[in-house]
Amino acid sequence: LQKNRFHVILFNNMNANRRTHTAENLQQRGPCTLKIQESAENYLEAILVLMQKNGQVRSIDVAHYTGFSKPSISRAVGLLRDNGYVSIDQNGLLGLTEAGLKIAETIYERHTVLTAFLTALGVDHEIAAEDACRIEHVLSPETFEKLKAHAKEYIENKQ
C-alpha cells in the first residue's frame, strides 16, 4: 500500500455494488487519500447510531442492528480497527476513531437529510430510509449540499 493510503475491503453480502469512496469525496476537508468501501461506511454509521442510542456498542449489537452474522461483523470490525476507523477496548466495546467518526457523521447526515426529503415528497418512511441508504454513498459533496439546501427550503415551505 502507498504511504497514507488505507484500503478497507469489506463485502456487503446484500450489496454486490462495491463502490469505493474517498473521505475527500465525502467531505471537503483537505487532500485525504483514504479509501473506504460503501459497506464499511454502513458499519461505521451503524456504530455511530448505536453509540448515540445505547452509549456502549459491542460487535453483537452491530450484528443485530445490521442483520449480518456475528462472524461477518467481527471480521468487518477487525478490518475497520486495523485501518484506523474503530477502536476496541479490553471489554470488547467499540468506539470510533476521529477518522471513523468523520465518515460516520457524514454518512449519517446524508441519510437523515435524504430520508426527511423523500418523506416530505410523499414517499413512505420505510422506503425513503431504504432509498436514502443507497443514495447517501454516491452523491458528491456539491450535489449533497445543494440537495440539502433545497430539501430544507422545500420542507419549511410545505409546513
Question: Where do the model's predicted regions map?
Answer:
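C-terminal regulatory/oligomerization modules of transcriptional regulators
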Residues: 2-10, 16-24, 130-159
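Basic, amphipathic "hinge/linker" alpha-helix immediately C-terminal to the N-terminal HTH DNA-binding motif
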Residues: 92-110
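Residue-level recognition of specific faces of alpha-helices
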Residues: 46, 76-79, 85, 99, ...
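Residue-level detector of intrinsically disordered terminal segments
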Residues: 13, 32-33
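N-terminal helix-turn-helix DNA-binding core of bacterial DNA-binding proteins
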Residues: 35-68
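Canonical helix-turn-helix DNA-binding module
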Residues: 59-90
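Cationic, low-complexity basic patches in intrinsically disordered or flexible, solvent-exposed regions
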Residues: 28
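Arg/Lys-rich, alpha-helical DNA-contact motif
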Residues: 106-142
